[in-house]
Amino acid sequence: MDDSLHRVKTPRKAAISSWIGSALEYYDFFIYGTAAALVFPKIFFPTGNPAAATIASLATFGVAYVARPVGSFILGHLGDTIGRRNVLVITLIGMGLATFLIGLLPTYEQIGITAPILLLVLRVAQGLAVAGEQSSASSASLEHAPEDRRAYYTSFTLAGTQGGNILATLVFIPVGALPEDALLSWGWRIPFLLSAIVMFVGLWIRRALQESPVFVEEKERQEVRRAPLPVLFRSYTPEVLKVLFAALVSVISTLFSIYALTYGVNTMGLSRTSMLWMVALANVVALGAIPLWGMLADRIGRKPVYVVGALGPAILIWPFIWAISQQNIALVFVFGILQSGIVYSAYSGAAFALWNEQFDTGVRMSGVAVGTQFGFALGGFAPSIAAALAGPELENWVPVAMLGSGAALVAMIAALTMRETYRVPLEGLGKPERARA
């Protein structure tokens, strides 16, 4: 037997490794979103029309989501053929380098149209790399976990993204407090350049994460497929489509962290620092709430918890954006933390267990990667669509709330059509005839 099987970390260590890796990886991803909302319209897209510049800047945030489906095919294939751990290293290096290079870019004023083109290229590179992060981390966590705690351990993957968001927000709070001239000339570069440290720390941590036991066993039995994607689409197309639509709940997250920040600061004149603190506190609450929702999903099932995580934000997005429109910062904190810190965390606690459990080991990472990344690609353009729907001054918030609610309800319906899997053993996942036995 392969010696690596004897060196597999305990489920707890595997989950912590995935948590830390995801946190470090998504630090890179979220700082771009924050900069796209607050800085890039002024230094990369100075059109003379603030609304047009904001839409263009937020569109570059969405461009990475277009690259994600391409990356999902490549990295999903690699994860199901060479292993989850190898893909985790590839994604970390790709994200870290692309983000660091963004921090070195000259501005539009310095090199003209070449500046936003280079920004776009690096943003695409980010999207390609991140496409395999959550699917590989969650697959590894699921496959290491005890049968009755799979949702709990898998939930640490998305809890890690909250950690990355917290880190990114806390870095941007002092940077955002700089005088406008300092922020636009050099201050915005600091979070991007710090990604070099993030990348090296992440690589040091992930070297301790061993390959999934079931993948190692499948490899030893020579059952690893050379081409998992044809098998995926031949046997699991309905499951891939269900995951795709269920992933649309991510629209709530992107509207919360990107559109709400833009609308609150640029349109309603709320304090940039206050809004960043609201995002940070919501993510701190989510950091603790997500594993608790995962524990509940192990007791009552994935689907009931998922419904709470989709239906709740579909309702709460209305008072949240309304509070921003009223410039009531206290209510913004209350509804922001309730929506994204507590209720949306139910989705995060159940999602990757439910999605991974629709597929067997040989196509699991491909299925989750392709399904989620196509869904996230649609959701990634939510901030720019919201900016267009809201009008030139971004003041018409009702269509934005409708967009978020509609996407969350579609996700809820998709999740309800999936097979409930919390009592299905690992070897029976993705095999309906065995799951019913």
Q: Where is each model-derived feature located?
A:
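Extracytoplasmic gate region of multi-pass secondary transporters
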Residues: 33-34, 237-285, 379-383
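Helix-loop-helix hairpin linking two adjacent transmembrane segments in secondary transporters
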Residues: 161-206
